[in-house]
Amino acid sequence: VTEERLDTGAADRIVGSIVDSTGISRAKTFPAHMLSWFVEVGAGASPSWAVFCVDDHLAFTPSLSVTGDLRLRIDRDRLRRIGDGIRWAPAGLYDQNGTRSSLCTRGVLERVVDALAGIGVQARIGHEVEFTLVGGHGEWAAYGLGAVLGQDEFVADLLRAAAGAGLGIEQIHAEAGAQQFELSLSPTDPVGSADDLVLARILIGRTARAHGMRASFSPVPVAGGSGNGAHVHVSFTRDGRPLLSGGAGPHGMTDAGGSVVAGILRALPGLGAVLTGSVLSHLRLRPGMWAGAWCCWGLENREAAVRLCALTPGNPHGAHLEVKPVDPSANPYLACAAILGAAHAGLVGALPLPAEVPVDPVRLTDAERAALGVDLLPTSPDDLLAALASSRLAGDLFGPSLREALLAVKSYEFGEFRARPPAELAERFRFAWTT
């Protein structure tokens, strides 16, 4: 392998990372002159990386234990400067012969994108990033001008870091919780969007530390407080034509667009362990939290799991869906794969669009919700695990080894922590997903 020197100093380095089954980024670092090695050969990584839990326990399975070895190889085309002589790139997991491992979550998303392309459909995804600054001070008001200006130096440095890393940020504002921010990333291809989400969290974490703070990406950083979401905005086209506008269906949806919505709604109950599967997630995924706890869809309905953002002059990116239940404990590659895989299943099955729910579902009677087929998404550990184990879609998307790893990790975490008080869990895991 030819070593390659970058235009950097001797102490400069390259960090390559993956995201594991519990949503935590795991990484290895090479000196900058070893770039080609990191790309072509990679760093050693035990298959046990797939069964790391949120507390670093290893939830070994019959097929994933202390034996074997994989290679962590970075995607050179995604190499980005993150400051202080550090470049970062997303990595994939490969076996010793150079074949993509079935445990590689980035590879799972790539396969789903290819499956959509096989039926002529392309997707674009943009992520919302919610986080809470711990150690910040000052008065706070949701969407408050004073709240943003009070952290103006942090915001300015974050935007500079993003520009230097080639990360598109479209807006940033103060959120409902004290010292809570939300920023929106520019939409792009699905794999690139997940890479961008990981990069955004890196830059947010580094910038917060530089200002004497820490950024929490926990679903519930403070018990009883506002939760952090990770809403996923996704649009679909076929042969260049949008599926969610220009049709004769509700709000301009095409029949295919209706099938996308139907596929996602049908799949969501079986994918909760992937999208909202931390020991804190159930504290956020509740009615009244704008977290999409109800399994239904509606135009600009922020209590629905799937919010339709229709094509209007105020929506320059075009019609798209916001999948609201997802929280920051989710692996972004698996979350995007789950959503796109569900959409693919809806399209292949030509599923009909369910009835719209145009109001907050909590305002409906039990009988009205039953007539519309509206129910809360599962949040109990037993329900989440059983749904993941029995979901045909999850099996098709993730394969036996990765699903086995997911079930092992979530089973351990729920068993170990489900009885702990919310305040204890919020404090213990406040920075578990911080980079």
Model-derived features: positions:
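Short, ordered beta-strand-loop transition motifs
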Residues: 81-85, 174-177, 308-317
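Short beta-strand motif preference
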Residues: 14-16, 183, 306, 323
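Glycine-centered structural positions embedded in regular secondary structure
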Residues: 27, 91, 227, 343-351
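Catalytic-core signal marking the mid-to-C-terminal active-site face
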Residues: 2-3, 199, 203, 213-214, ...
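Short, glycine-/Ser/Thr-/acidic-enriched flexible segments
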Residues: 19-21, 35, 77, 96, ...
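Phosphate/nucleotide-binding catalytic core
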Residues: 2-6, 84-286, 300, 322
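ATP/Mg2+-dependent ligation/transfer catalytic cores
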Residues: 1-169, 174, 196, 372-435
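Generic secondary-structure boundary/loop-capping signal
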Residues: 27, 35, 69, 128, ...
